[in-house]
Amino acid sequence: MTTILTDLSSSLSCHAASKDSPTLPESSATDLGYYSAHAGTHSPHDYFQSQPYSQPISHYPYHQFNLNGLGGPGTYSPKSEYPYGGGGYRQYGHYREPAMAVQEPVTVKEEPEPEVRMVNGKPKKIRKPRTIYSSYQLAALQRRFQKAQYLALPERAELAAQLGLTQTQVKIWFQNRRSKFKKLYKNGEVPGMEHSPDNSDSMACNSPASPTVWDNNTPSRAHDPQAQPLPHNSSPSYLEDYNPWYHHPQNLSGPHLQPPGTMHHTPPGTGAVY
């Protein structure tokens, strides 16, 4: 019994002590007053020393922009927090424009000039302009044509280099000249031209020799009874162009190419060989 009484008395004393304790129920109030009193006694040095630990989260961006002169920390506008949005777009556009400017000429060059045009609803190919030859080039081409109507590839390249023309231009000129020459011969305007040894026509081998063609410039031609007058439809202009055909092959060998003066002086003993 004595122990029970002592326990009860001790518990009652503890409850009384806890109830009468001035610190437990007023701990929050006393703590606030204590810390507020101490906060008033802090020095400015302690206040600024503890300030960086609580303020960098909210004031660090404002201090950064204050250095650039964009305004105070309190007047900073929310729209200027995104300066890289529009600037990035303009920067992309700035680098995009030169690329587009470079691509534009390429697209223009890729478009070829139209070589076909519509005439009466039908496509017609545009012909290239004709080549205009100078008088020097025409004279040189004419002299070469009188020597040979067909040119080998090295000869054509050499002639084109001498005259300042392309091989295609020389080739086309010779083709046109040959067709014109054949047309004149068929019309009878240039007689005896097919007998030239330079011509590659097979008809020249079957035609008889005509000695009056080779010595038309000699004075004995007027007294030659075998000389035949030229046809009336012959054109003097064409004869002047082809005049070298008549006398330049005299240096070639062959009995049918010799002038008539040399043919009459053959020795009489040559018939004994047969």
Curated annotation (Swiss-Prot):
A GO term for molecular function: RNA polymerase II cis-regulatory region sequence-specific DNA binding
GO terms for cellular component: nucleus
Biological process according to GO: epithelial cell differentiation
Signal peptide positions on this chain: none
A Pfam family per the record: DLL_N
Top-level taxon of the source organism: Eukaryota
Bilayer-crossing regions: none
Keyword Lipid metabolism (UniProt): no
Nucleotidyltransferase listed as a keyword: no
DNA-binding region: 126-185
Protein location: Nucleus
Regions of compositional bias (Low complexity) in chain numbering: 259-274
Keywords carried by this UniProt record: Developmental protein, DNA-binding, Homeobox, Nucleus
InterPro entries: Distal-less_Homeobox_TF, Distal-less_N, HD, HD_metazoa, Homeobox_CS, Homeodomain-like_sf, HTH_motif
Parts forming coiled coils: none
Main location per the UniProt record: nucleus
Region (Disordered): 189-274
Polar residues biased stretches: 199-220
Similarity comment text for this entry: Belongs to the distal-less homeobox family.
Protein name, UniProt field: Distal-less-like protein DLX-3
Native organism: Pleurodeles waltl
Source species taxonomy: Eukaryota, Metazoa, Chordata, Craniata, Vertebrata
